């Protein structure tokens, strides 16, 4: 206890040293912690997917144009994935510039068209109602979007007019996952609402354990005709890309920038380096300032040793002083 009191008295007496050292270390730690939180959030994108490393999307390459798509819309000279290896399969269609009508108000909406299997692969917290698309008219709204349309009213059972002229019924309200997500939307619609959508869907697969993904990619690397080559000589190839990797390939999702987020590994590496440098700078600055203070207190420590203070007590003084500074900075 005496050692603690002495250490505290020294820090209070040397106010300039304490303030400068404390501010330097606090700023360094604050910046490092903020950067580390950002880096961690980037590295945990889409962890709401039940198995993001083993849920795959179809990436097609048509004459150099890469994008997320599906195989079932290619009807000529193509190959499908053997259902014996598939544990779960779903599709989704992103509609970035869509809208719904509530009363007389036309409200822009980012719509995601899918089916109930989607929720077997991606976990979304349910805030109100139920998380299902049991009927073609079923719709799920995000909590933020529901508040935008209905305010504080109960949105469950409310009817909206979709852009194709059909009515949709709000069945549930979904919350935001704790992690950052690649796909962002306002409304989830049932794929059964219409037989004809304005764009092609993207297929997602979860394969059974032991499935040879490399063999599927090898098969997909063989060019195949999109249509009858007598009229259309274009070819396409396909490969599987995991949900974990989609976020890091912005070229696949840059057509819908308002619905899809993407990251950059190079930026993350640079930020990691900056974070490390900030942390090292703060630590070195802390050590240098304390060494200067230690040199100035050389006579004081010498007198203490003359009066019988042991080395362990002096070390405890130094250790407690630094611990108090670090804890204060944090």
Tell me the role of every PLM-derived stretch.
Residues 28, 325-330:
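Glycine-rich segments within core transmembrane alpha-helices of 12-TM secondary carriers
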Residues 115-127, 139-263:
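Mid-to-C-terminal secondary-structure elements
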Residues 14-41:
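Short, strongly hydrophobic transmembrane alpha-helices
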Residues 4-20, 24, 284-325:
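Intracellular coupling helices
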Residues 55, 200-204, 298:
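Short, solvent-exposed beta-strand edge segments and adjacent coil->beta transition regions
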Residues 259-278:
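N-terminal membrane-entry
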Residues 25, 29-32, 273-283:
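Hydrophobic alpha-helical transmembrane segments of multipass integral membrane proteins
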Residues 32-154, 162-169, 199, 218:
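Structured, solvent-exposed hinge/loop segments at the ends of secondary-structure elements
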């Amino acid at each position: 206890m005496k050692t603690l009191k002495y250490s505290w008295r020294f820090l209070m007496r040397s106010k300039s040293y304490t303030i400068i050292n404390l501010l330097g270390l606090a700023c360094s730690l604050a910046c490092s912690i903020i950067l580390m939180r950002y880096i961690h959030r980037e590295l945990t994108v889409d962890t709401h997917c039940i198995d993001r490393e083993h849920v795959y999307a179809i990436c097609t390459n048509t004459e150099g144009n890469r994008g997320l798509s599906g195989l079932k819309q290619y009807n000529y000279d193509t190959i499908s994935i053997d259902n014996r290896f598939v544990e779960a399969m779903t599709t989704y269609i992103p509609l970035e510039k869509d809208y719904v009508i509530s009363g007389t108000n036309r409200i822009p909406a980012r719509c995601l068209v899918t089916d109930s299997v989607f929720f077997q692969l991606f976990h979304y917290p349910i805030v109100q109602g139920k998380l299902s698309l049991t009927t073609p008219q079923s719709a799920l709204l995000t909590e933020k979007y529901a508040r935008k349309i209905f305010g504080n009213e109960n949105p469950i059972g409310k009817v909206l007019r979709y852009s194709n002229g059909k009515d949709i019924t709000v069945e549930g309200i979904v919350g935001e996952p704790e992690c950052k997500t690649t796909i962002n939307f306002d409304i989830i619609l049932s794929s059964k609402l219409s037989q004809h959508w304005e764009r092609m869907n993207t297929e997602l697969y979860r394969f059974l354990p032991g499935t040879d993904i490399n063999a599927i990619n090898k098969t997909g690397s063989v060019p195949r005709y999109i249509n009858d080559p007598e009229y259309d000589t274009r070819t396409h190839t396909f490969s599987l890309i995991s949900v974990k990797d989609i976020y890091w390939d912005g070229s696949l999702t840059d057509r819908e920038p308002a619905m899809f987020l993407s990251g950059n590994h190079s930026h993350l590496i640079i930020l990691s380096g900056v974070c490390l440098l900030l942390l090292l700078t703060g630590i070195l600055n802390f050590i240098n300032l304390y060494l200067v203070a230690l040199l100035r207190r050389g006579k004081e420590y010498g007198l203490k040793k003359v009066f019988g203070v042991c080395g362990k007590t002096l070390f405890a003084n130094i250790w407690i002083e630094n611990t108090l500074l670090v804890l204060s900075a944090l």
